[in-house]
Curated annotation (Swiss-Prot):
This is ATP-dependent protease ATPase subunit HslU. ATPase subunit of a proteasome-like degradation complex; this subunit has chaperone activity. The binding of ATP and its subsequent hydrolysis by HslU are essential for unfolding of protein substrates subsequently hydrolyzed by HslV. HslU recognizes the N-terminal part of its protein substrates and unfolds these before they are guided to HslV for hydrolysis. It comes from Nitratidesulfovibrio vulgaris (strain ATCC 29579 / DSM 644 / CCUG 34227 / NCIMB 8303 / VKM B-1760 / Hildenborough) (Desulfovibrio vulgaris). The lineage of its organism: Bacteria, Pseudomonadati, Thermodesulfobacteriota, Desulfovibrionia, Desulfovibrionales. CDD domains: RecA-like_HslU. One of its GO terms (biological process) is proteolysis involved in protein catabolic process.
Length: 441
């Protein structure tokens, strides 16, 4: 578990998310409390439940990004789901327990990757021996010393990269192509369907066939195979279950869409309340049956989010409200925040586009006045059309760099400066024609 302090967590989040200090501080404390809980004596530890959070704010202000970056920072299994995709069991939609099953799948994949990294050196050593067997098949006529000498020479050539493009024949698993049929498509039957597919997979193991491939591709496949052999799959599942139960994060988006706000029809109110009541046992703490065994949700952190334009958290059923004691409102974004988003984050859009075009030999630089003009345009379009927050910057950048992105292969060595005049040239027609801006930006 991460030992970062709340201040260090906020500092790391600042590298990727601009502003929203209140939300960052709240999630940082929530993660630190998990670390604190692990240091309590067992009798008290089980009594300390996570304080689930509701983030309120319009789209594109950083709700999902904060949760996703937090999970990555702490090495926690993380899944984002949308509340509107779940309906009462028996109606069209997905069973709410599927979010826990999906989180467990992510946890197993995460631990498998970690364990594979740990045994990679041993896997590479074993894969190298198998690779040399492909290059120099066993022959009764070969003398021991002669064969070993040839093998050592091939080993040296391989390590120097001289054999990467040589082709060999290798036995691989035959991939199953074509559409996959759902065994059970009814809500609540996903778990049974997964178990049935696993059973069929064990009864009819994958067929293997000979395939010609380059040595580098064969090497990658062999390393994966050897790493899989070295892993204790039962241990992987046990660690994953522990990680999911103690540090897992489920991000429930669009929670406001299942709240009964003003002006909603009574029929839809009943359906929305049904979704909330289905969510309640999972959030309260229950045991969910997965293909890897039973998973407890008592200490999974739930972060819910929504715009709450036409409803408010108090429109949720009281029992669910009580399970989300922490509320934080995220600030809307204006031109100053857009400018900071274009300049401050470690993964700023300007750096991304400059790096992409640099692969074609085209150098793109952004002036300060050009970035401020983009920020001003984004704020203006958000105010006059639909406010989609920072996502507006993506459409702006695509529009501004559309020509150079298309012509880049024909213009290697060229330098393009995106200043205020360049921005106005590419966006002015959209600003003048308000109807056009609705479709293009």
């Amino acid at each position: 578990m991460s030992t970062l302090t709340p201040r260090e967590i906020v500092s790391e989040l600042d590298r990727f998310v601009v502003g929203q200090e209140k939300a960052k501080r709240m999630v940082a404390v929530a993660m630190r409390n998990r670390w604190r809980r692990q240091r309590l004596e067992p009798s008290l530890r089980d009594e300390v439940a996570p304080k689930n959070i509701i983030m309120m704010g319009p789209t594109g202000v950083g709700k999902t990004e904060i949760a996703r970056r937090l999970a990555r920072l702490c090495g926690a299994p993380f899944i984002k789901v949308e509340a509107t995709k779940y309906t009462e069991v028996g109606y069209v939609g997905r069973d709410v327990e599927s979010m826990v099953r999906d989180l467990m799948e992510i946890g197993v994949s995460l631990i498998r990757d970690e364990e594979a990294t740990r045994v990679r050196a041993r896997a590479e050593a074993a894969a190298e021996e198998r690779l040399l067997d492909l290059l120099l098949p066993q022959s009764p006529a070969d003398g021991g010393e002669t064969r070993q000498s040839t093998r050592d020479k091939l080993r040296g050539l391989w390590r120097q990269g001289h054999l990467d493009d040589r082709e060999v024949d290798m036995e691989v698993e035959e991939s199953t192509k074509g559409p996959q049929m759902d065994i059970f498509a009814m809500p609540g039957m996903e778990s049974m369907g997964n178990q049935f597919r696993d059973l069929m997979g064990k009864a009819f193991p994958a067929r293997r066939k000979m395939r010609k491939m380059k040595l580098r591709e064969a090497w990658n496949l062999l390393v994966d195979e050897e790493a899989s052999r070295l892993l204790d799959q039962d241990k992987v599942v046990d660690i994953a279950r522990e990680r999911v139960e103690q540090t897992g994060i489920i991000f429930i988006d669009e929670l406001d869409k299942v709240a009964s706000g003003e002006g909603t029809h009574r029929t839809t109110d009943i359906s929305r309340e049904g979704v909330q009541r289905d969510l309640l046992p999972i959030v309260e703490g229950s045991v969910v049956n997965t293909k890897y065994g039973m998973v407890r949700t008592d200490h999974i952190l739930f972060i819910a989010a929504g715009a709450f334009h036409f409803s408010k958290p108090s429109d949720l059923i009281p029992e669910l409200q009580g399970r989300f004691p922490l509320r934080v409102e995220l600030d809307p974004l204006g031109r100053d925040e857009f400018y900071r988003i274009l300049t401050e984050p470690h993964n700023a859009l300007t750096r991304q586009y400059a790096a992409l075009l640099a692969t074609e030999g085209v150098t793109v630089s952004f002036t300060d006045d050009g970035l401020r003009e983009i920020a001003a345009f984004a704020e203006e379009v958000n105010e006059e059309t639909e406010n989609i927050g920072a996502r507006r910057l993506y459409t702006m950048m695509e529009r501004i760099l559309a020509d150079i992105s298309f012509d880049a292969p024909d213009r290697p060595g060229e330098h393009v400066t995106v200043d205020a005049a360049y921005v106005r040239t590419h966006l002015e027609d959209v600003r003048v024609d308000k109807d056009l801006s609705r479709y293009i930006l």
